[in-house]
Amino acid sequence: MSDDVDRIMAVMQSAFDPEYGEAWNRRQVEDALVLGNTHYLLAGEDGEAPASDAAAGDVAGFTLSRHGFGEEELLLFAVDPRFRRRGIGRRLLERFAAQARTRGARRLLLEMRRGNAAESLYLAHGFRPIGLRPNYYRTLSGPRIDAITFACGDED
């Protein structure tokens, strides 16, 4: 698992803008993965699982999610900027949804900051806004940004 955490951290470091403070640190990722209900997926350049011996720099994206009570929450979703606009995010989101459903998830959830470029991808995959948290995120430079919660599934 340590090698996979290295791969997750490499993508996260390149994909998340520090201005928004969305990236997790290594300890947060490791602590989440110790729990039996937290799952991750890695994506290579084709959006599929990379070879087990792939170097951290060869991983194009990842998801980290938590399952419980018939729901799966997408906690982190990232594609390295070098690999964006190639369908990797779309394929990774499809794989996430399929695997969540095999674990019994009837509803998929996520939260994002307003203005996140991935919003159109989420909408295209059936996610719908279900809530708004005004001024939820604070940027490093000070302004606050709303959080939007989305759901996809039988209860959205």
Could you tell me what each predicted segment is?
Residues 3, 7-84, 90-95, 99, ...:
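Acetyl-CoA-dependent GNAT
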Residues 31, 35, 119-120, 141-142:
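Short Asp/Glu-rich motifs
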Residues 79, 112-113:
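Short amphipathic helical patch at the helix-1/turn junction of helix-turn-helix
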Residues 88, 105, 127:
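Short phosphate-binding/catalytic loops that engage adenosine nucleotides
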Residues 89, 93, 115-118, 135-141:
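Short glycine/proline-centered loop/turn elements that form peptide/ligand docking sites
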Residues 100-111, 121:
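Conserved GNAT acetyl-CoA-binding A-motif
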Residues 109-111, 123, 128-146:
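Conserved catalytic-core motifs of GNAT/GCN5-like acyltransferases
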